[in-house]
Amino acid sequence: MFGVAVASSSPTVAARCAFANAGIGAVATQNITDPSKGPRVLNLLKSQADALEAIETLQDSSDFIEYRQILVVDREGGTAIHSGKHTLGTWGEAATKNAAAAGNLLADKSVPRTMINAFEETENSDLHLTDRLMIAMRAGNDAGSEEGPIHSAGIKIVDDMPWPIVDLRVDWTDDCPIDALDALWARYKPQRDDYVTRALDPTSAPSYGLPGDT
């Protein structure tokens, strides 16, 4: 299972920045982002490159790579991060096996390390990966987050299916987007497995419980 969680002062951040493929890995493209780098890295991972090799390939062959901040987790839990010299404002990065965190325009460069610490603290729990990433993202927010207010957030999770089993976004709010995303997850979580069942075997799927659904 792989996932990406992201929050930003910019609108619709997850639409541009979160990429993951089941059995392959996860990628976040940040800063002055180029969304094409997400699928490209996933293709490199699919071709048996590890996280570091994928980052090194981008560094050697991509235009404007110094404007990008790219995080990779590969199928073995290996991690790599590229933060170019034009990464905006105060920036930071941190990684451990199975997880990487980075940010720009931060209130404090220690924010990513705080996120990794929070993620590691839930390692032996029964929490779903979505919950673990939400906890890490909230820890980063509590540690200062961006220097200015954040307005959008999203989370994407892949597992055994060729589509994301969780793909939730708050594209803009004047309130805390992490709170809004957490509320959306709380609503979706009890139904998550039912939507997979409806895709694989509609005859055994539960009713939607909506007017007109018989």
Question: Predicted segments — roles?
Answer:
Residues 1-214:
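N-terminal nucleophile
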